[in-house]
């Protein structure tokens, strides 16, 4: 999982917990746009096509 930055891992953990971008932004004190960009980078780096796939990946990786 070293391919993801620490902040991307934080975002992925919250995505896997079912949090919305707005909720993640508030929790991590980021803009919604920044959360959106982190999620886009996560999808690209992990070669995934959806938020649901990212959430499943996070669960399998033990983030939740």
Please tell me what each predicted stretch does.
Residues 1-40, 45, 53, 60-61:
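Helix-turn-helix DNA-binding segment
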